[in-house]
C-alpha cells in the first residue's frame, strides 16, 4: 500500500483528504505544518508528499526545499488556494522532486486521481516525466487565461 504524507494546517481540509486517500487504500501520515512534515519524512517511509503552501512554523515551500534535498526520490505535490503563476513557479523552483501544483478547490476524487497518476508515472517513467507533464499543463492554463 503506498504511503502519502499530507501537510495541511486547515483541519477540515486535511481530515477530508486524508480520509478519502485512506478509502482508496493509501496509508496516510498527517502533518499540521511544514516542520512536522519534514520530520515525518525523516522518520517514516513515504511514497508521496502533498503540501499546502501557507502553514505555521514552516511554509510548504521551505518544507519542499528541505524534503527535496534530503529525500530526492520522493515526489512532492502542492495543494493550495494560491494559484497565481508566480506561486506555481515558486513551488516548482523548490526542487526537481516537485512534480505537481493543484489549486483548491479540488474535489477529493480529483486529488485521488492525480495521486494515482503521479505515483504510477513516477514509478514507470520517473519524476522528471511527471514534472514535465505538470509544467506543460500549468503553462497551458496560464496561456488560456
Task: Locate the predicted segments by residue.
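Receiver (REC) domain active-site loop signature in two-component systems and cognate sites
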Residues: 55
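CheY-like receiver
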Residues: 121-145
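Two-component/phosphorelay signaling modules centered on CheY-like receiver
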Residues: 11-29, 96
